A protein has these predicted regions:
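Conserved two-lobed SF2 helicase motor
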Residues: 202-212
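A substrate-engagement module of RecA-like helicase motors
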Residues: 15-25, 76-203
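Short, flexible loop segments at the rims of nucleotide/cofactor-binding pockets, characterized by
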Residues: 30-31, 55-58, 181-189
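Walker A/P-loop NTP-binding motif
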Residues: 43-44, 63-76, 93-97
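Conserved pre-motif I regulatory segment
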Residues: 13-53
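Single conserved hydrophobic/aromatic residue that forms the stacking wall/gate
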Residues: 1-12, 212-215
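Walker A/P-loop
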Residues: 47-66
Length: 216
């Protein structure tokens, strides 16, 4: 918490109380003692720069319990999840809801592996090759080309009309081995580089465990 001597661990319990910020700002929010206890434990660990291993059962409200002290803290926060679906849920729903309820001006970034981001270079090359024979792949490529002109993130999860498991994505995303880096003509517009830059600048970064292990 920004100044432990002033705010103390108790500060983190206040937003979760029955008259706190979360109750006022989130519909159907109901405080739970186990949730308050966990929030205090997380806040205490942050204040002491200690390691905390917390296990809580279903219905505890674990997400809000760690997000409240994390967002009230003034330092960099990395939230790591087990799946990309949970990443998206945190980034798109849970964190914005808690941030609004707490009225804290923290910035948020979402960072996934490079295989999740459309690559302009490989998209251009695939379009120019014209080697796709399956009608489904041709249709998917057309959808991806349209997506490339409108997306600000390049995150393939945003394009629901093309399944994330579709093989066409292998042709329009990059790997560490075939990425041209700074030599690429699209480097300034690279979605991977943009996501990494935003993650460096953000107060809260949402990653998955694979990315977390690779970069921490």
């Amino acid at each position: 918490i920004r100044d432990v001597a002033v705010t103390g661990v108790q500060t983190c319990a206040l937003p979760i109380s029955d008259r706190g910020a979360l109750a006022r700002g989130i519909d159907d929010f109901r405080p739970r003692q186990s949730q308050t206890d966990m929030a205090r434990a997380v806040a205490d660990a942050i204040a002491r720069r200690a390691t905390l291993l917390a296990e809580a059962g279903t219905g505890t409200g674990k997400t809000f319990a760690y997000l409240v002290p994390a967002l009230l803290w003034g330092g960099k926060v990395i939230v790591s999840t087990g799946t990309k679906n949970l990443q998206d849920q945190l980034f798109l729903r849970d964190i914005p809801v808690v941030r609004k309820a707490l009225n804290v001006p923290v910035t948020i970034a979402l960072l996934k592996g490079r295989a999740n981001y459309l690559c302009h270079f490989h998209l251009d090359r695939t379009q120019q090759n014209g080697r796709l024979t399956a009608r489904e792949d041709v249709g998917y490529l057309r959808e991806i080309a349209r997506f490339a002109k409108t997306t600000s993130t390049g995150d393939k999860s945003e394009l629901s009309r093309v399944p994330e498991s579709a093989l066409i994505w292998n042709l329009v995303t990059s790997t560490r081995d075939n990425c041209l880096g700074a030599e690429c003509a699209h480097y300034q517009d690279c979605f991977v580089m943009r996501a990494r830059k935003e993650a460096q600048q953000a107060d809260v970064v949402v990653v998955n465990h694979q990315i977390g292990r690779a970069h921490v």
